[in-house]
Regions:
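Short glycine-enriched nucleophile-adjacent loop
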Residues: 133-146
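Active-site nucleophile loop of the alpha/beta-hydrolase fold
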Residues: 157-165
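Gly/Ala-rich beta-loop-alpha elbow adjacent to hydrolase catalytic centers
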Residues: 105, 128-132, 136
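The conserved beta1-alpha1 loop
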Residues: 45-49, 129, 160
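Alpha/beta-hydrolase fold nucleophile elbow
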Residues: 117-130
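Flexible, membrane-associating and regulatory peripheral segments of lipid-active enzymes
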Residues: 1-78, 82-89, 93-96, 100, ...
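Extracytoplasmic/secreted cell-surface and envelope-processing proteins
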Residues: 54-56, 87-90, 134-137, 165-168
Length: 168
């Protein structure tokens, strides 16, 4: 079932939960559903940290949406989920998952937002928490390798980054 959220002008926008990224891409690209308000141009992407399964990702994304909404954000909010719940003491598995997921985030930003939705670099900001920073920063790195000197997004805010200094 689709969740909905009201907009300040009285409209109600669907916010569907997709079990797989491909399902979201296919539905949004064929206009059979989707999670975007096409009347808004800005996108805020939230990448959760380690220790989140799919349900916890929805919860943390909902919490972040509420906080950004009450702070004044009124654009499109997208929760990007990844497999970061391998559990302690196996943090290395989560790190491996973060690196394996970063290409999917790159594809989502580049192909879904830039190509299908027509978003510009100025239209996309990203929040990432904990090991989600590795997912986000590696996606940016992969973009720079493919297209040196170009930007993928406008701003990234790294919250409690669980990455090591040698990363940079």
């Amino acid at each position: 079932a689709a969740d909905t959220y009201p907009t300040e002008d009285g409209r109600v926008v669907p916010a569907n939960r997709f079990e797989k990224y491909l399902d979201a891409l296919l539905l949004s690209s064929t206009n059979q559903g989707g999670t975007y308000d096409d009347q808004k141009r800005h996108y805020l992407i939230n990448v959760h940290g380690a220790g989140n399964d799919l349900d916890a990702s929805y919860d943390s994304g909902g919490e972040m949406f509420i906080r950004t909404y009450w702070a004044g954000y009124r654009g499109n909010f997208v929760q990007f989920s990844w497999n970061g719940d391998q559990g302690s003491p196996f943090f290395a598995n989560n790190v491996e998952n973060a690196f394996q997921t970063s290409p999917a985030l790159l594809v989502f930003l580049r192909d879904n937002l830039h190509v299908l939705r027509g978003a510009t670099v100025a239209d996309i900001d990203l929040l990432s928490h904990s090991l989600g920073n590795q997912v986000a920063l590696d996606a940016i790195r992969l973009h720079q390798v493919a297209l040196p000197g170009t930007s993928l997004l406008h701003n990234i805010t790294c919250i409690e980054a669980a990455i090591w200094g040698e990363t940079f």
